[in-house]
């Protein structure tokens, strides 16, 4: 069975000199939470930006749910919005005029899912991170 996220021999070269990523491979099994940990400048953010489709790898392959979304050698490059993937940036800013629930559901509005399914998914995520009781509060009320 394929992993929901499979990265093989990923390489990203921005310019002359050392590559930002050189031969990174990993798989994230279903239900797992994985941390990319390392010193500043080691390629963590570049790796995630390649997975999300915000950077184009120089070589290697990225598959999401068994579907190849990036393979320069095969001429495959699926755009970010078509990857069925979300990303929270390191400097993520919330929408201050929205509630916690509205901030969480916002990215789902671009997906082809019903409002009921989106509401269910948001409730599950808020429960998972212990924020259910704050769902309808203004997001700026969180510290």
Give residue spans per PLM region:
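The feature captures the beta-strand-to-loop junction immediately N-terminal to the Walker
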Residues: 37-39
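ABC ATPase NBD Q-loop/coupling interface
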Residues: 61-83, 113-114
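Helix-to-loop junction immediately C-terminal to a conserved catalytic motif
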Residues: 52
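Conserved ABC ATPase signature
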Residues: 138-142
């Amino acid at each position: 069975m394929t992993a929901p996220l499979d990265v093989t021999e990923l390489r990203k070269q921005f310019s002359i000199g050392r590559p930002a990523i050189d031969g990174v491979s990993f798989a994230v099994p279903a239900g797992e939470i994985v941390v990319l940990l390392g010193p500043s400048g080691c390629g963590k953010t570049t790796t995630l930006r390649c997975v999300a489709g915000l950077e184009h790898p120089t070589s290697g392959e990225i598959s999401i749910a068994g579907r190849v979304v990036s393979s320069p050698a095969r001429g495959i490059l699926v755009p970010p919005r078509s990857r069925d993937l979300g990303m929270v940036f390191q400097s993520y800013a919330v929408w201050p005029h929205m509630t916690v629930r509205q901030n969480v559901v916002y990215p789902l509005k671009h997906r082809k899912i019903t409002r009921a399914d989106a509401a269910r998914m948001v409730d599950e995520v808020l429960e998972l991170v212990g924020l259910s009781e704050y769902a309808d509060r203004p997001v700026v009320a969180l510290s």
